[in-house]
């Protein structure tokens, strides 16, 4: 199963040799269920990424939690707070994966292009899911919960982990030209689901 973003990332022509190399890797072990693309420069799909080294939890939910920890519940969020979160959290969680790096074992990824083994897709008991509840704690230690968007690929990808399968970002599987991308903390505020 091939999944591809149909925005500007999906327009990039992936090198045919790297697609073949990726398929060889995918089928090199029975327990590899899926492979995902990388980008030159900043890896742009932090929302989907879950692993033990780079991003254990939802990137944008953690951005929101970092914002809330710096304000009181009634405060307006200032540009200074947003800049602090950008410097203290986002910049530390912005990565580039060298094309010569070894495949990166992950719990979830996408990067605009992914290939899954159909056998594992058919055995996947999880579906695409786009909402979650996020716990928030403010500067005065008051807490609340909020409905928040969730990257739809994550739950689906966890279904492969449930099957004891492996997923990988392949650093050589490039699907975007060099781009120095920065993530804006305001995006986290836009992902709050208002009822």
What are these regions (language model features)?
Residues 8-134:
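Conserved catalytic core of nucleotide-sugar-dependent glycosyltransferases
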